[in-house]
Amino acid sequence: MSLPLKTIVHLVKPFACTARFSARYPIHVIVVAVLLSAAAYLSVTQSYLNEWKLDSNQYSTYLSIKPDELFEKCTHYYRSPVSDTWKLLSSKEAADIYTPFHYYLSTISFQSKDNSTTLPSLDDVIYSVDHTRYLLSEEPKIPTELVSENGTKWRLRNNSNFILDLHNIYRNMVKQFSNKTSEFDQFDLFIILAAYLTLFYTLCCLFNDMRKIGSKFWLSFSALSNSACALYLSLYTTHSLLKKPASLLSLVIGLPFIVVIIGFKHKVRLAAFSLQKFHRISIDKKITVSNIIYEAMFQEGAYLIRDYLFYISSFIGCAIYARHLPGLVNFCILSTFMLVFDLLLSATFYSAILSMKLEINIIHRSTVIRQTLEEDGVVPTTADIIYKDETASEPHFLRSNVAIILGKASVIGLLLLINLYVFTDKLNATILNTVYFDSTIYSLPNFINYKDIGNLSNQVIISVLPKQYYTPLKKYHQIEDSVLLIIDSVSNAIRDQFISKLLFFAFAVSISINVYLLNAAKIHTGYMNFQPQSNKIDDLVVQQKSATIEFSETRSMPASSGLETPVTAKDIIISEEIQNNECVYALSSQDEPIRPLSNLVELMEKEQLKNMNNTEVSNLVVNGKLPLYSLEKKLEDTTRAVLVRRKALSTLAESPILVSEKLPFRNYDYDRVFGACCENVIGYMPIPVGVIGPLIIDGTSYHIPMATTEGCLVASAMRGCKAINAGGGATTVLTKDGMTRGPVVRFPTLIRSGACKIWLDSEEGQNSIKKAFNSTSRFARLQHIQTCLAGDLLFMRFRTTTGDAMGMNMISKGVEYSLKQMVEEYGWEDMEVVSVSGNYCTDKKPAAINWIEGRGKSVVAEATIPGDVVKSVLKSDVSALVELNISKNLVGSAMAGSVGGFNAHAANLVTALFLALGQDPAQNVESSNCITLMKEVDGDLRISVSMPSIEVGTIGGGTVLEPQGAMLDLLGVRGPHPTEPGANARQLARIIACAVLAGELSLCSALAAGHLVQSHMTHNRKTNKANELPQPSNKGPPCKTSALL
């Protein structure tokens, strides 16, 4: 870390803690920041734009304009009694002359292409020509709407070509801007234009960078909003508090330079770190979003603070140096405060937005998990249990789409209410000033001189109003009126004393609801924070419980004098918990009373089964009154169901071994098993799990778990990993990814079967079946259908991508629906479905089609082992290994007529990995298809394995079990990939192929060197005690495994 960073690193932690607090209470922080910024926004804009102070009541019969403003818009003419000429006066001069005869001359032109149109009748008309009327009155009257005798409505318009005369608005804006910029030379204008172009490029880069890290719009918009809030707060501070206002022109010129210099790189880096951290976090780590935001700010905050402090010191220095230039000093002060507020808002407002983005990502990932599990055949109750476990670390209110909409609506509604009044007043002022009036000098008409008008012989002033145009009311005028009326009505309603208070109250209620939901979410977050401690307490409970059991069984023995443990309050609590649960989860009890069977049946029919003791429930099962498979549903306690089933089977099978704990059953999450992995559960089978590695695969290091009971298998694969790493690691290529299901159907005749095959092979048939199949799943996508005929039997092989799930159940659902559509919609009514699976898949059976066409993931893994490593690590030589591989794996397997078995022991590694990682063990039949190739390259050994049918998934099936899921976490591939569906399953297939590569390399080396038997004798025959059966002891049963843990 550089020296400047070291000096400010102590400032990072307060900012990181602030960011974590904001992430915990995002709605609170966002609302407070928006309210403060909105207050500053209203104050600043009212100061900079004075014309917004007009009342919005001009939508009446006559325009209600302030007299002073209307007087300024008129062209004034004066004639004294002693003169016959009219003198042009300014507004100030006309106001200084007092005369009782002051008239307003209005010129009204009716725009109509039809000369026969009936025009409205008007009062005070002194002259008319064609469709133009001149009105002379003592008060200005400009009606917005007139009605002719035939009912035609005429609407006031500046001209008849543009709605609201947007052209004039644009023209006046350009004129004002031109007047301001005329003071600059061309070089300055070029610099300003370049600054705005660079500003546009910076904004484009912001959206592009955010899109790359996973946000299409909202994070970019949030970054801009953060800077805008900082601008408004700094403008309010300098303008209202410090009385150092920066001119509007300086803001227009200087802000692009500030934005370009500072940029948005730090906000992009904060977002990138947070999203990448979220993607790297495995599902079961349960890290909270607030901790991710804390780490992001802690890692990136030093650079953020360093750069902002540098900018702030630069502006302060500039203000001191140029103190003789007030405009520049004020702008430097504004820039300084803008940086300060932007820094604070980055740790509050922007961090809160980031936390909400992460929460939404968690919701999305968890929803994908639940939908995938349900599509893969896991019952909804089990899927919900897993879904809740995955989302337990997230705030509860964000799981509800209604709550998300409520939070967003609160903020968006606030912004709309703030801007509606401003927008309405601005619209009204703009219409009045740029549409109805302009600064043109209007000449006095000639008819004034000869027209017989009373009082014109006296001292008189005539103020000529701008010419007004009226057009017949059309449809688009009505639409415009409706829009303006709605805006005006809402604006007036907001300003109403009662409604404004009601809206404020409603907004307060909205915030209170969000606060309530957030407080409710703390319960779930606190539960997850407490869960690690509760796990420790559970372990203590198990230890204390085991110790209690052993003590009760050996209480006749003398007490140990040297191992006494003091009793604490926690021990008392744990003992009470044990006593409360002992009656439910006890394996056997001699003191349990058993009621008559008839009474038990009667209670069961009244759904009182849960209130019976275990022996009574077991008695119902033994006597055939309660099915063995229905215990979980009836008892609503999966662990108790396992216990009762063991008691019942110990009687039915006359095997008291199930009463003991030699087959363990305690401390296991059977909720994940029920409906997903196994039925009639009586416990679980512990299998030793070893680990090999690290193994470098495509540049990434992995520790790979293996569950096996075969000695020296893990040690052998470990040696292979060491040799592969010495050569730089393994590289992989995935050539195919598609699970298959092969239904068989029958037609009455061969002609119809052949016609259906031709249709399915055609583009029309493929597209029709794809459309039907893809409609059944969010994840499964049909790639291709392969067909073949055997008599009138038609076999179809559906190849489908299934995301990160292995996907057999998912595909079966799509196949069933596709076959149904063929019968009902595509004209194959005479088709008979023989079986959804016609062994053309082929699943869990050796088949050449899997070896040739592939099934699941097709992976090729390769590694180059240096010659000296072959000698030093593998204790062999390159030529011997190449010769062995040809003779054994290629020629030997061919002589045996093997299909896909051109390897040494790929099934060993595949099965061990499948058991450890929750895969279907039966699918090792086709997943173990492998051909191992070796050749010598420049004295080194190049070895590869090609496995065309690895069938794996990282969600569903056995992966829902916590131990297997934890091993997937060890590899970093648990659950669905957050951004690229199927990436985790494909990576798992690569890892399995590389593990097979390591096992093949080590075993072939042992065979070439003649070490195989020796290694097995060493690892599997270490002592004679390992092979001895345990003998009963008079001192009591052996110590339980749970007690040792």
From Swiss-Prot:
Q: CDD domains, per this entry?
A: HMG-CoA_reductase_classI
Q: What mutagenesis or variant effect is reported for L354A? A: Leads to increased stability and reduced response to degradation signals
Report the EC number(s), separated by commas if there are several: 1.1.1.34
Outcome, altering Y350A: Leads to increased stability and reduced response to degradation signals
Q: Where do the record's glycosylation annotations fall on this chain?
A: N115, N150, N158, N179, N428, N455
Positions contributing to CoA binding: S716, A717, M718, R719, G720, C721, K722, V873, L874, K875, S1015, H1016
Q: What is the effect of changing L219F?
A: Leads to increased stability and reduced response to degradation signals
Which reaction equation describes what this protein catalyses? (R)-mevalonate + 2 NADP(+) + CoA = (3S)-3-hydroxy-3-methylglutaryl-CoA + 2 NADPH + 2 H(+)
Mutagenesis or variant effect for S215 to A/T? Leads to increased stability and reduced response to degradation signals
As recorded in UniProt, coiled-coil segments are: none
Q: Where is this region: Disordered?
A: 1018-1045
Q: Which residues bind NADP(+)?
A: S777, R778, F779, D804, A805, M806, G807, M808, N809, M810, I811, S812, N1020, R1021
What does the UniProt record report as the effect of altering F257L in this chain?
Leads to normal response to the FPP-derived signal but no response to the oxysterol signal
List residues, modification Phosphothreonine.
T565
UniProt cross-references to PROSITE patterns, sorted A to Z: HMG_COA_REDUCTASE_1 (PS00066), HMG_COA_REDUCTASE_2 (PS00318), HMG_COA_REDUCTASE_3 (PS01192), HMG_COA_REDUCTASE_4 (PS50065), SSD (PS50156)
Q: Which InterPro entries match?
A: HMG-CoA_N_dom, HMG_CoA_Rdtase, HMG_CoA_Rdtase_cat_sf, HMG_CoA_Rdtase_CS, HMG_CoA_Rdtase_eu_arc, HMG_CoA_Rdtase_N, HMG_CoA_Rdtase_NAD(P)-bd_sf, HMG_CoA_Rdtase_sub-bd_dom_sf
The Gene Ontology terms for molecular function here are: hydroxymethylglutaryl-CoA reductase (NADPH) activity
Q: Which GO terms describe its cellular component?
A: endoplasmic reticulum; endoplasmic reticulum membrane; nuclear envelope; nuclear periphery; peroxisomal membrane; proteasome complex
Transmembrane regions listed in the UniProt entry: 25-45, 187-207, 217-237, 244-264, 302-322, 325-345, 403-423, 498-518
Q: What happens when the gene is disrupted?
A: When both HMG1 and HMG2 are deleted, cells are unable to undergo spore germination and vegetative growth.
What keywords tag this UniProt record? Endoplasmic reticulum, Glycoprotein, Lipid biosynthesis, Lipid metabolism, Membrane, NADP, Nucleus, Oxidoreductase, Phosphoprotein, Steroid biosynthesis, Steroid metabolism, Sterol biosynthesis, Sterol metabolism, Transmembrane, Transmembrane helix
Positions of the catalytic residues: E710, K844, D920, H1016
Q: Which residues lie on this side of the membrane: Lumenal?
A: 46-186, 238-243, 323-324, 424-497
**Free-text note on domains in this protein's UniProt record:** The sterol-sensing domain (SSD) is required for sterol pathway signals to stimulate hmg2 ER-associated degradation and detects both geranylgeranyl pyrophosphate and a secondary oxysterol signal.
User: Which protein are we looking at?
Assistant: 3-hydroxy-3-methylglutaryl-coenzyme A reductase 2
Q: Which organism is it from?
A: Saccharomyces cerevisiae (strain ATCC 204508 / S288c) (Baker's yeast)
